[in-house]
Amino acid sequence: RIYEHPLETAWEASGLKLQSITTESWMKLNDRWLTAYELKELANNIKEKLDLKTTTEVISGDQGELSYASFEGIQDDKTVITVTLQSSRSDYLNETQLGIHTVNNSKLKNLRQYLNGLKKTITGFSNSLSINFAIILAGEYHGKMGRSLVKEISGKMFRKLEAEQVDLIFENEGNIARGYSTLLSEPNTLQKSAFNIELTTIYDQSRNITEVVLASPGGNK
């Protein structure tokens, strides 16, 4: 289905229920050192642009050559967002950076539209050419997922992504499959020898549950 996000199509191939959608972004805002007060003002501006109802106060402070500000909030679609601002200075470098972590545990009608909207808003905070926007889909499998099932599920997911598998690691309590898909990389951001899709399974013996995580660490079309 053309309206689906490639990661959504891949996840559906696994047959597992999608339980959460997370994004992680980190970017440089400018080449200046900002005080904690200035970061707090910036945090309030970001809160308005993200249309957040804050669930925590803005926490800010200075620690020598480092200043910071952070807060959490929630959007109307139940996306929980954590914003972190950090500014540092030295004899060689002044820099302010922004980190944004989002998580949504509800069922979304259009994941592609949701992710594209988030990415447009988040990347709009910076003019940097090297903004990372990672996407993580997660769910659970009841019991311990054996190697054969990991191979089967990763194969189904990677075929939907037209991905070439570049790595497969088996460990006692967890497995990792990595691949490269041209459906996910933006032009000139990843080389063929790298990977831009990763499937991780981690067995939690106390709950007899295997956590399944499908992640793309870079930009997406």
Model-predicted segments: where are they?
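N-terminal leader/presequence regions that precede the main folded/catalytic core
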Residues: 1-80
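Short, hydrophobic/proline-enriched secondary-structure or compact coil segments at domain edges
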Residues: 20-29, 92-102, 210-218
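Short beta-strand-to-loop capping motifs
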Residues: 28-33, 102-104, 139-141, 181
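Short, flexible beta-strand-to-coil junctions
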Residues: 30-32, 75, 88, 101-105, ...
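Extracytoplasmic beta-rich ectodomain segments of secreted or membrane-anchored proteins
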Residues: 59-149
